[in-house]
């Protein structure tokens, strides 16, 4: 069970971080500058597509996902990149995706 809500910095007040696993981060370029508008895909441990969101103008993205191993893949006109995150439980798990 995974989903991709509207992107932004603030989590909705209804999110219970003791029960929800939240994967959040930013898409950045090689200089660490935000890449807005990138498509960010959430892939499961077998590399199967699970969800996709469009990063905010400041490169922010967020997914609600189950604990486990996930690959985040960012696709943009400026380049592409992958990052792996392995949340073991509820809470916020931050990872940036660097594109090249």
Swiss-Prot record:
UniProt xrefs under InterPro entries: CarboxyPept-like_regulatory (IPR008969), DUF1416 (IPR010814)
Protein name: Uncharacterized protein Rv0814c
GO CC list: peptidoglycan-based cell wall; plasma membrane
Pfam families: DUF1416
Organism the protein comes from: Mycobacterium tuberculosis (strain ATCC 25618 / H37Rv)
Entry keyword Aminoacyl-tRNA synthetase: no
SUPFAM superfamilies: Carboxypeptidase regulatory domain-like
Cross-link Isoglutamyl lysine isopeptide (Lys-Gln) (interchain with Q-Cter in protein Pup): where in chain: 98
High-level lineage: Bacteria, Bacillati, Actinomycetota, Actinomycetes, Mycobacteriales
Domain of life of the native organism: Bacteria
Other noteworthy facts: Pupylation of this protein has been demonstrated, however it is unknown if it is the product of this gene, of the identical gene Rv3118 (AC P0CG96), or of both of them.
Keyword Ubl conjugation: yes
This protein's UniProt keywords: Isopeptide bond, Ubl conjugation
């Amino acid at each position: 069970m995974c989903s991709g809500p509207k992107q932004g910095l603030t989590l909705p007040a209804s999110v219970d971080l003791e029960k929800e696993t939240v994967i959040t981060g930013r898409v950045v370029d090689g200089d660490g500058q935000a890449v807005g508008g990138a498509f960010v895909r959430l892939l499961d441990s077998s590399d199967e597509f699970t969800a996709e969101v469009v990063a905010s103008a400041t490169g922010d993205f967020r997914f609600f996902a189950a604990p486990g191993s996930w690959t985040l893949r960012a696709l943009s006109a400026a380049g592409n990149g992958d990052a792996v995150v392995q949340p073991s439980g509820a809470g916020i798990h931050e990872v940036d995706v660097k594109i090249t």
